[in-house]
Amino acid sequence: MKKLLFILLAILLVGCQAKVVEDVDNSLNNIIEKGKMIVGFTEYPPMGFKENGEVTGFDIDIAKAVGEKLGVEIEFVYIDWDAKVLELEAGNIDMIWNGLTITEDRKKEILFSKPYFNNRIVVLTLKDSPINSISDLSDKNVGVELQSSGQSALEASEVFGSINEMVKYTTITEAVLDLKAGGIDAIVADEIFARYAVSKEADAYKIPEEVFNSENYGIGFRLEDVALRDKIDEIIDGLAEDGTALEISLKWFGEDLLLR
């Protein structure tokens, strides 16, 4: 009887030890050991995009600075935005870092960093368009990036039931091309992108004053990767303190927009 009890206790102890091993968060150590951090991004200027074959943008520059502090290489992998969570969970990327809005629904699938950027959802339309408010979207064809905050904001708005059609695009740049070609009447998107588009072609576009809502951007990690998330937050705080983040923000926006 005593021998049987000893065996049962031994099995229980081994099981508990295995559970402890399973619960150890090696997310940060794994990155350091392999010497590389894989960042998922999409075509979303000015946060992250390709220009002349090179990956660039505000988020890209901040990520590179984080990599230097951490002592690892940063690999940028282009992803379909509507498959971002699948890419993360499959281990194809270590994080989503490209104007990712923090929402309660996304928190169920994604572990977020501290907010690092504030943004609003606005309407982008052609300079000579009669659209000057959200209500003017009624009976219009409105473009959005698939699975974006712009899509969510439009669907949740009072005007949604009266628009002619919501046209979904894989990337926001595709929506802009269609807007310019006359395929749609307006786009609902992040203000930071809309202002970037206007800055590039001030004579082509305008942004009505009325906004849908305000939001914060965060970096998205796997739910269990707390150690990695905490370290990235710590490094970004340091970049804000030593002036590196300010320099990057001034480069892209002409002012300090980092929420740290």
Feature map (PLM): residue ranges:
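C-terminal motif of bacterial Sec signal peptides marking the signal peptidase cleavage site
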Residues: 12-15
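Extended ligand-binding regions for polar small-molecule ligands
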Residues: 17, 21-22, 60-69, 135-136, ...
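Extracytoplasmic small-molecule ligand-binding "clamshell" domains
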Residues: 20-99
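Ligand-binding cleft/hinge of the Venus flytrap
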Residues: 49-50, 63-72, 150-169, 198-202
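Acidic, polar ligand-binding/catalytic clefts
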Residues: 64, 68, 73-136, 206
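Periplasmic-binding protein-like
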Residues: 117-125, 173, 191, 195-237, ...
